Amino acid sequence: MSSTSQQEVNIPQVDHKLPTTVRGYVRSFGPGLVLAMTFLGTGDLVASTVAGANYGYDLLWTLVIALVARGFMISYIAKYTLMNRFGDNDIVQGYKRVWRGFPLFFGILIAIVALVVQMSFLRAGAVGLYQLFNKTGGETWGVFLWSIVIVAITLLMMVTRNQYRHLETLARVASVIMVGSFLYAMVKVGHFDFSGFMKGLTFGLPENAGPFFAVFIAVSTIGAIGGSTSNLLYPGFMRDKGWVGPKYRKLQQLDLLFGMLPMLVINVLFWSVAAEVVHGSGNTIADENDLSAMMTSVVGPAGPYLLWICIFLASFTSFPSQSRGFCSLIFSCVHHAGKLNERYATPDDNPWFKRVQIAVYIVLPIIITMPGAPDLVMLNILGTSVATSLVLPPLLIGLFLMTSRKSFMLPGQANRLWEQALLGVISLIGIWSTFEIVRNFFRQVLHIL
């Protein structure tokens, strides 16, 4: 790979004032939580619950690896956008400086991944509403009709002001409801296998159980939770808050921590409830009906309602924001791959931006809610994990190169040796998980069929 010719520029100054009090910092937080709730779509919920139900705590180490990898990965993405010497506030610009072909390469991959991910979010949200409203619409077309409702609400949000503020508020509410719901479920369980929990933090693969292989659950958890292409959306959320330039690095790190903590708690709660209730009972989780049965056995008649509320909130905090975020990434790739930057100041100025966002990433995903489409669990375990894993290795390698080169970063801000080693290990884990997902994909499909 060869870098393009570089020219250092002055970082533009931004008038947004940094907070000076604890209350000020807390009120400033938002991008990290919005991003975390964007991540915390059904991929996390389903991956953690299926792993806990089918394998107990034996694969808990994959969750730790996934969340640590994600946290560091996002942090270094933010580091480049805040502390590069060129004034780039678009991560795609950095990838282009590593290799001219990256924007087009990423654009093609992300376009495919985004559609699969949006389909999983829309189906999850529609299933949640369908179940919450007593299966209104019938078994055949009910989920499809509720998907139209979600699409309509999303389109309405697009024409309202302060979209980001609405998403930030919804993310805060959703995180509280989800933590509260599964904490209540955990209290109702009444027991916790602490020794099993601690043992699950050590590496190892158990015997296969349920419809999904242990190795496939392990790598899909790492891929779906740790290596999501949604990691690339964080700079866009920072720009929406006006965080441009190195002075926001400390605030950004605290914000990311603020967002990742509830994500960790929610994932552990999903996992623990499933491990304590389903694992060892002779049952497994293969579809959304099994998820509902699990919550019924724990909480009683209110259990499924809590589950469907969580599933709806997890998907709906993701579907609108990722339609814009993914589309922005794709157009940024197209923008920097050719000469469109000579015609439009930003990728969002392209008149095709809104058209593609609406047609491809809001309306087209409706097809996954039609009769005969894959169920919620199958779509997330097989579809989302495979799609996201394909982007992970080049994403990590490019990030390693751009943040480690002194010619790319402000003086003293290039990765030190320990940071290079850390990113190198994360990159190797990403490459391994991609290899294992691809290697086991067809074997897993044949096993299910």
What are these regions (language model features)?
Residues 1-45, 217, 244-247, 251-258:
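Membrane-interface "cap" regions at the ends of multi-pass membrane proteins
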Residues 35, 62-96, 105-119, 321:
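Juxtamembrane transmembrane-helix boundary signature
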Residues 72-83, 238, 261-290:
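Extracellular/periplasmic helix-exit of transmembrane alpha-helices
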Residues 102-137, 315-333, 376-377, 431, ...:
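Hydrophobic transmembrane alpha-helices that form the core helical bundles
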Residues 127, 131-136, 151-174, 185-186, ...:
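Membrane-water interface regions at transmembrane-helix termini and the short interhelical loops
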Residues 133-160, 176-183, 348-367, 392-398:
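Transmembrane alpha-helical segments of multi-pass small-molecule transport proteins
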Residues 158-189, 385-391, 415-420, 425-428:
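Membrane-interface loop-to-helix entry segments
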Residues 176-208, 215-235, 395-408, 433-445:
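Hydrophobic alpha-helical segments and their helix-loop junctions in multi-pass secondary transporters
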